[in-house]
């Protein structure tokens, strides 16, 4: 069955009105959704209400949006890291978990400009104990030296074969490097060169541990020089 309509559109007071000719719907009077068919003054008329969306966000909503924007951008830059650091948390993605846990670590000024507190940022989160790692930097050689202290096993919270990682983040360039260190049950020193184009003054350093199978992690800790 085919319906043939001849529409002529008119707009009055946020309503769209269309005059139509249909042999099958002559003198129709019916409503379907936001469309009303009627017969008036010898003509078939279809009326549709136009709904407009009013968006008057409060200061709190604007601040929330600013935080979300900066954290979503950061999560993209750190994606290979947070995929290891946020596992088995809730039903969402690692990026969603990262964003949710770090909302309180972002401040917003009166112009709705968001600033991340990198000294409190979590690039990993979980039930494992954080590893014990210290770092130094050689300006002459442009090398980071990560010194790792062996930890005893704690059933359910720390295992000798847990994998320890360091993460370097260049805050101006927005680039990250993930460095595998040693197993939790080992002492040792691991060196890593400052990447080209990076400025040491802009680098933030973090460490965390994961289960050997990658299905669990510790909270990350910021490392200071």
Regions found by a protein language model. Give the residues of each.
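Long, polar/Ser/Thr-enriched low-complexity segments
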Residues: 2-4, 8-130
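Charged linear interaction tracts used for macromolecular binding and regulation
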Residues: 89-225
